Amino acid sequence: MNWTVDIPIDQLPSLPPLPTDLRTRLDAALAKPAAQQPTWPADQALAMRTVLESVPPVTVPSEIVRLQEQLAQVAKGEAFLLQGGDCAETFMDNTEPHIRGNVRALLQMAVVLTYGASMPVVKVARIAGQYAKPRSADIDALGLRSYRGDMINGFAPDAAAREHDPSRLVRAYANASAAMNLVRALTSSGLASLHLVHDWNREFVRTSPAGARYEALATEIDRGLRFMSACGVADRNLQTAEIYASHEALVLDYERAMLRLSDGDDGEPQLFDLSAHTVWIGERTRQIDGAHIAFAQVIANPVGVKLGPNMTPELAVEYVERLDPHNKPGRLTLVSRMGNHKVRDLLPPIVEKVQATGHQVIWQCDPMHGNTHESSTGFKTRHFDRIVDEVQGFFEVHRALGTHPGGIHVEITGENVTECLGGAQDISETDLAGRYETACDPRLNTQQSLELAFLVAEMLRD
């Protein structure tokens, strides 16, 4: 398989050689044990990596540097981080309506949070690369190889479709590039207009069963916008927005193929993972001596690490020391995913231990993954109340310790799916079958996402 030109793989342009020290560090990282990797032929994977090494990147270093600057504000308590999007992107749903819907949902949430926090909101989407998922078992209930995301195999319950296919690496890149191109176009051509986004939010308040609760906040935002209009404020920032791309750095054949060399802030050559602006290491692949953490050490992108209920304060400190050796504010985001019943007990000693190191990390709450259960009707689901409660517990911990609750990381969609229970729509277990469309884990629908944003805005104002 080739990219878009009829050139044999062995004639594609090669990347310039890395400086010796970077080459040594990268090789050492990739030689470590790597969990959750596809089992495909090494020679075919090498051929696909060669293709990806010759293509234009999905992002560019200057955008990553700009994101790093904004994340430094979050780490210092001067901004808030909103990260959200599909649990797993699919090639089939990589369409203009779906991407537009997700971008719109993220923008709607961001407007509410910006007003509630009275500070900038850094917007990061789970988009343009979230095509792979770790799984708890290699074989599913049908006796087939588990679906691991479109980057690795197909979703259809068919043995041939479930084979691990390295040519999907190139398909993932093509879809990611197209998605990122559309995101840039949408956010610079009117969709991100503050007045338009607020009008959508007013519609939510008008039609939602819980709208009355949020009417006061929406009216305040409305008054603020009218005041700016009366003053003749017509700044470009009111018409556009920056949305950065993120995904879990899971499939190392993909991540390593998208590495590019560029000069850093200090003029020294650095390796940027240009498959995204920022990546995170998941709960199942964050082995302290594994390849994923070592890979994250090598790249210049800001990175995140998921912290589940088994995390210890001592291990959290070790992640901080390895991934943020130069104490760069916002370089590292620690994403707690404890579950609503555990966050109030487990998070405080971790925060205290990390804060004592003097590192300025971002504390972010993932209220989704610790609150997943199977419904009586057989669907994997999450209850809206538990999601809200984990965010509330996260805020309570940080308020008590005097630290900054820096952000939330949520799985959302701009479509009216029925995957998570509860919320103002009061989705029940019998409703789940109506529009249960996720390729992996359940997502908050548009109304639930915006309802969560209004509730978090209230927390930010308290």
Curated annotation (Swiss-Prot):
Molecular function GO terms recorded: 3-deoxy-7-phosphoheptulonate synthase activity; manganese ion binding
Annotated positions binding Mn(2+): C87, H369, E411, D441
GO biological process, one term: protein homooligomerization
Cofactor: Mn(2+); Co(2+); Cd(2+)
Pathway(s) annotated for this protein in UniProt: Metabolic intermediate biosynthesis; chorismate biosynthesis; chorismate from D-erythrose 4-phosphate and phosphoenolpyruvate: step 1/7
Domain of life where this protein originates: Bacteria
E.C. numbers: 2.5.1.54
Inhibition and activation profile: Feedback inhibited by tryptophan, tyrosine, phenylalanine and chorismate.
Family annotation (Pfam families): DAHP_synth_2
SUPFAM superfamilies, per the entry: Aldolase
Cofactor, how bound (note): Binds 1 divalent cation per subunit. The enzyme is active with manganese, cobalt or cadmium ions.
InterPro entries: Aldolase_TIM, DAHP_synth_2
Keyword set includes Cell inner membrane: no
Residues annotated to bind phosphoenolpyruvate: R126, E283, R284, K306, R337
Catalyzed reactions per annotation: D-erythrose 4-phosphate + phosphoenolpyruvate + H2O = 7-phospho-2-dehydro-3-deoxy-D-arabino-heptonate + phosphate
Record's keyword terms, sorted: Amino-acid biosynthesis, Aromatic amino acid biosynthesis, Cadmium, Cobalt, Manganese, Metal-binding, Transferase
Residue stretches spanning the membrane: none
Cellular compartments per GO CC: cytosol; peptidoglycan-based cell wall; plasma membrane
Keyword Endoplasmic reticulum: no
Functional note: Catalyzes an aldol-like condensation reaction between phosphoenolpyruvate (PEP) and D-erythrose 4-phosphate (E4P) to generate 3-deoxy-D-arabino-heptulosonate 7-phosphate (DAH7P) and inorganic phosphate.
PANTHER family per UniProt: PHOSPHO-2-DEHYDRO-3-DEOXYHEPTONATE ALDOLASE, PHOSPHO-2-DEHYDRO-3-DEOXYHEPTONATE ALDOLASE 1, 2
Family: Belongs to the class-II DAHP synthase family.
Quaternary structure and partners: Homodimer. Interacts with Rv0948c.
This protein's name: Phospho-2-dehydro-3-deoxyheptonate aldolase AroG
Organism from which the protein derives: Mycobacterium tuberculosis (strain ATCC 25618 / H37Rv)
Organism taxonomic ancestry: Bacteria, Bacillati, Actinomycetota, Actinomycetes, Mycobacteriales
UniProt gene name: aroG
